Amino acid sequence: MGNQTTVAETTNTIAGSQTFADVDLRPICENMTNSEFRAVFATAQVTAVEKLGARITALQRWSQDERNRVSKWFGRNDETTRMRLLTGLTKVLAVVRGFNEHNVVRSGSAGDLATGCTPHPRGTENEAAHVCAPDTATHTIAISARFCTMRPWTDGADSHVSTIIHEATHFHDTMSSTDDKYTITPFLAPWGRSNPDLAINNADSIAGYVVDGDD
């Protein structure tokens, strides 16, 4: 059974009877222990919280620099766009702060499957993580293999930090974001300027806007 073990439990209903349960002992990341993973995730989580907080503050102040930043990623900087980001990122921040050992799980684990969403038809080989958008009760984030070998942080490409933000935007009680354009690259912001109606709802555009550059 690989990295699973069979555990016998004595019941309290019939003398001497036992039930058997398979306990999944596989780590979240194959290249590190769960303790090491928790430390890696916590470090990225702290940075994500800091970056989200910085953007929320900047959106509240609404300086010309922030207006330019919003235009760079979303092709417009009107009040509707500002409020979409301000309201949404405030909710995203709360979810990111709430990620913990109970709702950060391995992709394909019982905790992942319990969210009720069916597996992605393309599989998980090319994804870093996924969530079940309607899962507003637990906000579970499932970690896939790509996350385990990603860079911890960078301001111009996918990373642990951008992945955490990206996934948190998908929940229906945050921003109900979409995946019209994947991957943070130098081409993502120009795509957003050409497709503002899509970009304002695109998870990687939102994450790219949050992590872009130094504050």
Predicted region positions:
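Predominantly extracellular/secreted Zn2+-dependent metalloproteases
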Residues: 1-161, 171-215
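Walker B catalytic acidic pair
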Residues: 167
